[in-house]
Amino acid sequence: MAGQKILSLLVIALVVTFAAAARLLDEENAFSATTTTLGSGSGSTGIGFGAGTGSSGSGSTGFGFGAGSGSSGSGSTGSGLGAGTGSIPSSGSGPGLLPTASSVPGSLAGGGSGSLPTTGSATGAGAGTGSALGGGPGAGSALGGGAGAGPALGGGAGAGPALGGGAGAGSALGGGGAGAGPALGGGGAGAGPALGGGVAGSGSALGGGASAGPDNTLVFFMHDILGGSNPTARAVTGVVANPALSGQLPFAKPNGANLPVSNGVPSNNNNNGIVNNNNVPFLVGLGGTTANILQNNNNGNNILNGFPVASGGQLPSGSALQMLMFGTMTVIDDELTEGHELGSGLLGKAQGYYVASAIDGTSQTMAFTAMFESGGYEDSISFFGVLRTAVSESHIGVMGGTGKYVNARGFAILKTFTGSSGTQQNQPHQFTDGLETVVECTVYLSY
């Protein structure tokens, strides 16, 4: 019983072996171009099963399994079952030749002898209308040393941006091509901005340039008030009423024996600086000369409470009045505010003096110190210069300071605005009944 099973298995194995061999033979006959010979015969591979030997024939491949030697011959396939040896396939050649690197069947994209396509991409040294990759002049982008009409990447000259050392009509990025775009890197001639060490960039050069920052600016408004019930400016000198001078008007002495304006009796030296029609002409403010500043109070001399309101008589105008004002010194203790209104935020005080330094009354020589409330009046700036009332603005110099403005340098621009004079009842927006002159002071400081 056991012998029958073994015999059945051997028969089945033999049938399977022959079926597989026949199938392999059919497949090898279908692909004759890749047929290789095994052994020394002109047939195919021999297969041996067991100790049997395959005879030489003119058939197809022989297969050897085991230690048997299946020889290739011109006969039919020999198959042996046993301890035969199968020979290793040798290096024989079939009828079909494989393509090698020496012969190119068509256009090869590489380093061979094939020509580059005219409309495609060129990776060799040829010239194409597409992108040129390599050293050839392509009409597209040149990558490497080629000259492409598109962007040039590398050392080529492309009409697009040149990346590297190429000369591209676009932006030159890298080691210096002549690109019409921005030159980024080691210098080309780019028409855009040159970033880095670019040589001839017609755009802006971003590098080690230095730009000057703006000055430190400070703006405040100074309110100079003449007369009224609460003046901030007081005249301390006037012209000399000396008949020996024969009408000549030298610089002043303290307010007292002044030439009367209304043909009245000159006031004596004991008037204690009272404001009346004998010394009103000497009260010229920062706004310049004003003829219509005197109220006609029944020709009375003491008009302190009513001065100055533009509702009465007029002082003499012309050169005589201007000459009377020449040399008048006025001390000030003006308020500094944030805005042009007198009631706006208080910044500090301006203390000093100004002198009517022009015979026509159009300029004031000023020297004052602006002290600021924010630091407990410890921070201050000193100014000196000439304020001209006949021009739109004047420049005076900064003469140092204290606190955080110590050793300050710079200048200030002064603009004068003559405020409306009047009583508090008639003009409630005014906080004074005197003649107010507003000076806008814009300070430019450097340290």
Curated annotation (Swiss-Prot):
Gene transcribed to yield this protein: DIR10
Self-association and partners: Homodimer.
Gly residues: bias regions: 74-85
Keyword Signal: yes
UniProt subcellular location: Secreted, Extracellular space, Apoplast
Entries under InterPro entries matching the protein: Allene_oxi_cyc_Dirigent, Dirigent
Biased composition (Low complexity): 86-107
Gene Ontology biological process terms in this record: lignin biosynthetic process; suberin biosynthetic process
Protein name (database record): Dirigent protein 10
